[in-house]
Amino acid sequence: MGQTKLNYLYRKNQDLFGSFLNESSVKLGHQDYFGAIEAVTKAINLNNKYPIPFIRRAEIRYKIKDYKNANDDLSEAFKFKKNCPENYLFRAYFLAYSINKNLENSKDAIINLEKAINLRNTSKAKIWPIEIYYLYEKKGDFLRESGKYDNAIFEYSKAILSGINNPLAKTRLHYKRGWLNYYEINYAYAINDFSIAIKKGKQIDKYHYFMARGFSFIKINNLEKAIEDFKNALECNQLAIEFYKDFFLNFVPKETCDLVVIYFGVNLEKWS
């Protein structure tokens, strides 16, 4: 076969490869997920040594909760990661974290999340689909759910110090870290976190922050400030104390609960 014909066949193959990927994107845009998978599979059948189609198929399969096959696709993609653009490799690592979390494979989930964080931190790229604070927050969430509160606090702190420009996200992080500081008996730090959340948070959510700080004040025997915070919480939401009834009953001394009941006129029957 002559070189000219070989070049022609190569170009034709590449054109088909690109057209199948485009077809997949169009079908995905119309939420035809199975049609999109079929199209990208045709591209893979033409060239199964290129990582991007595997990543794209994994993303589609993730949308339809086909986690096992999505994970298999990423395993294939990672075989060719040396030829993978950083933005796609980052997407693949974060997707692998999400998939393995859904598969309850905690070890692989955290490994891939750390790879995404490391790539994000070492790359010279300026534009990323996910802010670094969000990655630290997800790692903190993961560690919190695993009961590793000290490590989770460390990750939330990195998120807060990462130059985050989203005030609502920053408030959320202080609130999360505040509760972990509470459970780790770091009450002064918890009070500071909740105070920041009160200052920066949306009005509709502030009753949560006031209640949390009030519980922290109870732990350092400052009932006067605790009562003041509970009062502020009620001004934000008249059902604030009722919302935290179980917390009062399980984590607050009975004499303090009785004081709150008397001071705020809570229905005693609901607390029995």
Predicted regions and their residues:
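Alpha-helical tetratricopeptide repeat
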Residues: 1-272
